[in-house]
Amino acid sequence: MESPTLADWVGDIETFTGRQWQREPAVFTPEALAPPFDLDVLDAAFDGGLLRTPYLEMVRSDKVTVPTEAYTTSRVVNGVTHEGFADRAKVIERLRAGATLLLRCVDQWHRPTGELVARLSEELGRRVEAFFFLTPAGGQGLAVHRDDADVFVLQAAGRKTWYVHDAPAAADWSLGELPDDERSRQRLHRVLEPGDLLYVPRGFAHRAVGAAGLSAHLSLTIRDLSLQDLRTALAQQLAEGSALPARPLGQAAIADACGTLLGQARERLDTIGPEDLLLAARAASLPPATPTRPESFAETARAWETGGPGTGRPGLGSVGRTWRRLRAAARATH
């Protein structure tokens, strides 16, 4: 594993991969851990007025469902009512009542978080997602559960007590909340403070309780492959290079297509090894390559005014100047 980003967080990568990676939970205190999403950024997101469900959710671990209308409001746009916009006053009220604020897929709508996620994904060759949690002291947003991902927790504010338990005992384990009758040995008990980083291996059961103030942390989930990912990749590998018509016409043509597909699959199976399948599945699981940052509207406007792209259609500024010249000329003739 090579990852400059992780090296900044956990120190020596070889030591981390040999001792902790997918083996053991651990807490690190990097010299300078600055989560890209914190309480100031959260306030800015609310100030912008566009934060809404499904990116916004409030949760409790005590099986009490927090209804959407308890923390959102509606807006009327062009005569149509739209629901699900974040309401800060309602959110704070729910926080005071013990609920946790959960922001999903922060990397999709906050550029600095998206840049961190893209960098980490490229370094690790894994799909990465970002979630933000805000929990009051004594509050617990999620019951003890297992994630289908390795998780890095970046503590941004307040304090939170974490309990991490054993990995699944069975190979065919289930993600999500643990059944009431399942017991799992505790492996780590630690209070995180701002600047701390917690690593939770994939599948290790865990829960967290607010310890002091409003606890804020950013969770980065590092996804890995499932059996379905491998099956999908295998199907794609077996079908690769097939030039059969998409819609065979008639029963004879359909039967011929069956025979051809089976023959091609047998030939391809002889050339595909486990490593080939693994690489194909990993490649398919990654998000599309991040494009170069798109041209901004300000850049477009500057190019428009200076003879760049779009000069065939004058912008509003040039239209205004033309109108003023015509008006001045008309006045001069009278």
Please annotate each region the language model reported.
Residues M1-A7, D180-V191, R207-H334:
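Fe(II)/2-oxoglutarate
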